[in-house]
A protein has these predicted regions:
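Short, basic/hydrophobic alpha-helical segments
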Residues: 80-87, 169-197
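An anionic, glycine-rich sequence signature occurring as long contiguous blocks
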Residues: 14, 122, 138-170, 174, ...
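Electropositive nucleic-acid engagement tracts
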Residues: 25-29, 35, 39-108, 187, ...
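Basic, low-complexity segments
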Residues: 1-25
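Short, conserved catalytic/metal-binding motifs centered on acidic residues
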Residues: 52-53, 93-106, 133, 199-207, ...
Length: 416
């Protein structure tokens, strides 16, 4: 028996689920995916297989096999999900957002589990880590792709690699979180379902010159947070290709500092030296607290890439407005052109809150972290269906025109 809240949504959920039917191969898989999706949308305290099976009237063992072992196309579901999100939330000013989140675990048998750092957990803990791609636009925001991070040491352990409980395919090779992020960005842009001109991320991703270069090659602008120690030049770095050494020496091809070259500086030191008149107050939207005011400053710089001059772009700095100016100053790098407005640059740089809120909503409302499967395939299957449930409820939220945030049940009907 379905809850009254979900009963009103069931026709729309059936239509939504039908979009993904071709990725489940057999009728049994389509039926199981429908029931699991309903279970994720229901207000169940703990959305594991047993509890979902009990609430939706499905055999637990069959649902477990569907999640852990059935070879359905979860990547195909992600492509269709991105098309749905593009239809519902797409806008020319869309932004792709990168971040990772941890999934605490008590056991040692899950794929990729181990003591590792998790920014969302705020500590080193026994957990799995997933790298995620979000999409944000003026119409809303949600999660649109996922990758399970498998540490190099974990993959190099023969016992873990051969574990039947983790069941990691032999074809899976080590990839850094940055590489996983790049895979998702590339795939999303190549699919073309999500209109997005920008990419943003925190310093864990923004510090990577290689990832920034990938975004540029993909034809997008980035505005990413970077560490305060990141070095740039505020003027011509005065590097050039040195002349041939003698008449018979080989022509030189690599740029080197000229005698009048100035050293690169840490962005933190550059920002601290800015005059007060360089700071301009702007209001930006940031999470459940609504619009907030910050002070921003920016200047054109040359990025330092692998110890040499890289592309020219913007250094953006943000500090709290008013009496909190002694608080942490955040710095960003962007490859946007000189003509881009400060207001747009500031808005994009401050959009990382969207993926943080989506992690909180997905874990609290659609059971993103409630899974109890250990297999590599099981992780991808559960997370994929949770992303589908989240996007569906986000679309319902938009249709109803009702605010949905932590503490407000996703399935609650609009007020009369």
């Amino acid at each position: 028996m379905l809850d009254a809240d979900l009963a009103a949504l069931l026709p729309a959920l059936e239509t939504f689920h039908a979009r993904f039917g071709r990725f489940f191969r057999r009728s049994e898989g389509r039926a199981a995916s429908r029931k699991y999706l309903i279970g994720l949308a229901l207000p169940i305290e703990r959305k594991n297989v047993e509890n979902i099976a009990e609430r939706v009237g499905a055999p637990p063992r069959k649902l477990q096999e569907f999640l852990s072992d059935s070879p359905w196309d979860d990547d195909g579901c992600i492509g269709e999900l991105q098309q749905f999100v593009g239809e519902q939330l797409g806008a020319p000013g869309g932004v792709l957002v990168l971040d990772d989140t941890g999934f605490p675990k008590k056991g040692i048998h899950s794929a990729g589990v181990g003591r590792q750092s998790s920014g969302t957990l705020g500590r080193v803990d026994n957990c799995q880590v997933g790298v995620f791609l979000g999409y944000a636009s003026p119409h809303g925001h949600t999660l649109v792709d996922r990758r399970l991070y498998l540490a190099e040491g974990w993959l190099a352990d023969p016992a873990k690699r051969a574990s039947r409980r983790a069941a990691v395919p032999e074809t899976v090779r080590f990839a850094t979180k940055l590489e996983l992020a790049g895979e998702m960005l590339t795939a999303a842009i190549e699919r073309g379902h999500l209109p997005a001109g920008w990419v943003t991320a925190d310093a864990a991703y923004g510090d990577s010159a290689d990832l920034r270069a990938l975004v540029a090659r993909l034809g997008r602008w980035y505005c990413v947070e970077v560490s305060g120690t990141t070095e740039v030049w505020t003027a011509d770095p005065a590097w050039a290709v040195p002349p041939r050494a003698g008449r018979t020496g080989r022509p030189r091809t690599k740029v080197r500092p000229r005698s009048d070259a100035t050293p690169a500086q840490a962005v933190r030191e550059i920002v601290r030296a800015l005059p007060e008149e360089a700071w301009i107050r702007h209001r930006v939207t940031e999470g459940e607290k609504g619009p907030r005011e910050y002070e921003f400053a920016r200047l054109r710089v040359v990025e330092k890439v692998h110890r040499a001059p890289g592309p020219e772009g913007w250094l953006l700095a943000r500090r709290p407005a008013g009496s909190d100016q002694a608080a942490e100053i955040k710095c960003y790098l962007s490859n946007a052109p000189a003509t881009v407005a400060l207001a747009e640059l500031a808005a994009v740089g401050c959009l990382r809150w969207t993926i943080e809120e989506d992690f909180e909503l997905a874990k609290g409302e659609v059971g993103l972290d409630h899974y109890e499967v250990t297999k590599f395939r099981g992780w991808y299957h559960h997370i994929t269906l949770a992303l589908l449930a989240l996007a569906f409820l986000k679309a319902v939220q938009r249709e109803w025109g009702k605010k949905w945030g932590p503490g407000i049940r996703a399935g609650d009907p609009p007020a009369a």
